[in-house]
């Protein structure tokens, strides 16, 4: 089966006037992260950034058009893969250390970032070399 090229990796679906779903349709649904882009008045919000094998910023123009706050819902590998591409990042205090130092054993990539998570592999994928780049948060979130 032919691997998927970077230009075909992401899909965007407009859900409302200012809300867009971004996802990686070649990842099996159990592993797939829903990324959400919300257009704001002064800046935009991006909730989660997917696997990170291909640059989200380079291949989804929507996330590079305006200033953007990037939020991690949690720090599993399939939710923080491209956080390093965005300068303004935030995460809950309980997961800040993982975002800053995303070791595969902390992000569950050591167990789940395998060829089996894909319906079709992305070009250049090598599970043994998969790593998430550090993306320390500039802002910490708390309950309440």
Question: Each PLM stretch: what is its role?
Answer:
Residues 1-8:
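Basic/polar N-terminal segments that are highly enriched at the extreme N-terminus
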Residues 9-62:
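Conserved beta-strand hairpin/beta-sheet module of binuclear metal-dependent hydrolase folds
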Residues 1, 22-25, 41, 109-112, ...:
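Short acidic/polar alpha-helix capping motifs at helix-coil junctions
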Residues 52-143:
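Active-site HxH/HxHxD metal-binding segment of metal-dependent hydrolases
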């Amino acid at each position: 089966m032919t691997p998927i090229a970077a230009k075909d990796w992401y899909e965007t679906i407009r859900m409302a006037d200012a809300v867009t779903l971004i996802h990686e349709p070649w990842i099996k649904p159990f592993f797939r992260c829903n990324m959400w882009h919300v257009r704001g008045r002064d800046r935009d919000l991006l909730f989660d950034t997917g696997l990170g094998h291909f640059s989200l910023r380079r291949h989804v123009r929507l996330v590079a058009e305006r200033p953007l706050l990037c939020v991690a819902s949690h720090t599993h590998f399939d939710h923080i893969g491209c956080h390093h591409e965005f300068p303004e990042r935030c995460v809950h205090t309980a997961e800040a250390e993982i975002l800053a130092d995303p070791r595969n054993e902390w992000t569950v990539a050591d167990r789940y970032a395998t060829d089996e998570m894909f319906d079709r592999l992305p070009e250049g994928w090598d599970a043994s070399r998969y790593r998430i780049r550090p993306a320390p948060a500039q802002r910490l979130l708390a309950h309440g």
